[in-house]
Amino acid sequence: MSSVGYHEPIEELSDETRDMHRAIVSLMEELEAVDWYNQRINACKDEQLKVILAHNRDEEKEHASMLLEWIRRRASTFSKELKERLFNENPIERE
């Protein structure tokens, strides 16, 4: 995955930037895992296995949520956007 690497020399990056990179890459991986589990559930014929896969998928959602909150607490602009756009009935595309 190209997102795992750095675009600038690592020795020029602060600890905060490297930690944010770790969190963003981890969030991407968790969301990718949710997608993979959704596909497996959709293709699976065994109902018991579907339940297990759904449980695993939902744990990935928990992990993604924790990472998103960690990012929100450390990135003020991201925090502002999330607070304005999440958990309301306003149009998503509003400016």
Stretches found by the model and what they are:
Residues 1-95:
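Iron-associated oxidoreductase/ferritin-like identity signal
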